Amino acid sequence: MGLRNVLRIGHPALRTCAAEIPDDWFGSQRLQQLIDDLFDTKLACSGAGLAAPQIDEPWRIFVVGMGHNPRYPDADPLPDRALINPVIKSIGDELSAGWEGCLSVPGLRGEVERWQRIHLKWQDREGAFHTEDLQDFHAPVSYTHLTLPTKRIV
């Protein structure tokens, strides 16, 4: 499929809870195509992350990654990866506020408060589990796309 349309603010799919990717999808062409479509669409829109519900797919998966990005000129590079069935926990109580954008709300940014540090657990394309602690720009990007649906903006 390649590039997909990004749903815009107000679309009901952006307020629907995403379902976990079933075990029998791991390693399948269907999952690989969904991941490829998410990355292609994110790249075409100069995004840092994109969640499946944003392209009208009801699954708990998001992709992140960027090198130099004109939308985030001061951000450190973020490695490309697909995070499937992610679970997040805050590390400590420290919150930070930052200006964030969303591909589903083009042209607008808002100040959003997020956990400064998070512990993230997810599965990769093949179903293997991974864990990582994230902070600074990497934590809010992951948190934003993990917590869809959100009613703050969409």
Residue positions per predicted region:
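Single conserved hydrophobic/aromatic residue that forms the stacking wall/gate
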Residues: 150-154
